[in-house]
Amino acid sequence: RDTIGNWSTSGSFAITIDNFDKICSQIQAAANTCDLVLVNAGSSAGSEDFTAAAVEKLGRLLVHGIAVRPGHPVIIGFVPRNSAGVSSKEVPVIGVPGYPVSAALTSEIFVEPLLRIWQGEPEFLPVILKAKLTRKINSPAGDDDFLRVVVGEVNHQWLAAPLSRGAGVTTSLSKADGIVIIPRNIQGLEAGDTVN
């Protein structure tokens, strides 16, 4: 809720236990009354992660998993709004990973841009600067890796210091003032490499 606190919100639904039928019921109730449904957690591939199956049962599951890290198990789909048993407008559903850093990144990549478009606001264009990476970073091939960094100027040169990583490392959210995107075809960066 804090990540999108600046945006207009119309509803919040109770936490639902990991039960397929109850999750289906809550998603449908939200689709019936809201323009966008965000489901937090339950998007991975565990035995208690029912969001993808629920969206698929209720409507159309478009994506389950994207090539970004953190945030890989994102779900994107549509569920029809039902009014008096009649289906009408399809409502977008985004399944947000449960880990906080993954959830924040998912909001930055998918939720905020969608809300900006709907509200007629301009696209967010971040300040981009070139900086030298302060230490070596390993990155798995196949995913765009979003690395949170602290940026500072030392001796007239910008430096980017990588923060601790992991989908649950919340200090990276509060301390970061920059993000370095390591493309999926690169398996890491060396200390001293220039990054944006």
State where each predicted segment sits.
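Flexible, glycine/charged-enriched surface loops at secondary-structure junctions
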Residues: 9-13, 41, 120-127
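Residue-level "edge-of-site" marker
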Residues: 16-17, 44, 68, 80
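Flexible glycine/proline-rich
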Residues: 56-196
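Short glycine-rich anion-binding loops that position phosphate/pyrophosphate groups of nucleotides
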Residues: 42-48, 98
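Phosphate-binding glycine-rich loops and their immediate beta-loop-alpha structural context
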Residues: 1-39
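Short Gly/Thr/Asp-enriched flexible loops that form oxyanion-binding sites at enzyme active sites
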Residues: 46-59
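Short acidic, glycine/serine/threonine-rich loops at helix termini
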Residues: 23-25, 49-52, 78, 105-106
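Short glycine-centered, acidic/aromatic-flanked micro-motifs in structured strand/loop junctions
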Residues: 40-41, 135
